[in-house]
Amino acid sequence: SSDCTAEIAEYFASLDTRIRLLRNPQNMGVAKTRNRGFDIAKGEWIALLDSDDVWHSDKLEKQLAVAGRAGADIIYCSYALVNESGAHLSDYIVPETTSYDAMLRESVLSCSTVLLRQLILREHHFSAEHYHEDYALWLELMRFGYRAVACREILVDYRVVNGSRSSNKFKSAKYRWEIYRDVERLSLPRSAQAFLTYALHGMRKHRRF
């Protein structure tokens, strides 16, 4: 990271011995960096937070409560879309559950909203070969039959930043199609059907900006 993330993490690590700051010897890219963290982590659950996003203070507590009741492998939550200044744009309320077929049509999981069992991530990693490495992993987990359940409360502020990977709609669409065809090996008709639904959901989700 070229911003102050490391310094901020270092400060909090000095206050709490449970926090460990790991520095890459060189820029390894987002997928390999996350995978390194997965391999080192010792806890039962793993949560991710992208540097642009904000967790609400009770996010982990509420997701763990759902995990205890539901016995799920993946817990995800609803989120608020905010702009670069933190101003509210819209809310995205996730469905109670999702599946492989549902995730083909609309991805309700995102890095900053998921809580995953560590055992899963010992066997499944982000691929550095794909632009949408997170979406490719979510599909893989669903295909393997892991159970995902929602905490439907808004527990994350998801920041929409001009020029970010997620804000480039045309490039996102291109790589979504490649995942359908090259990674999941879907037929042309099934890919087209999933892509059309994905596009319609995207227009609805981002209609306010």
Which residues does each PLM region occupy?
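A conserved acidic beta->alpha catalytic loop
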Residues: 1-8, 26, 50
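Glycine-rich, basic loop-to-helix element that forms the pyrophosphate-binding segment
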Residues: 24-41, 62
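Short aromatic/hydrophobic "clamp" motif used to bind/position activated sugar donors
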Residues: 46
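Conserved donor NDP-sugar-binding/catalytic core segment of glycosyltransferases
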Residues: 58-89
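Non-catalytic, C-terminal membrane-associated alpha-helical segments of glycosyltransferases
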Residues: 148, 154-155, 163-209
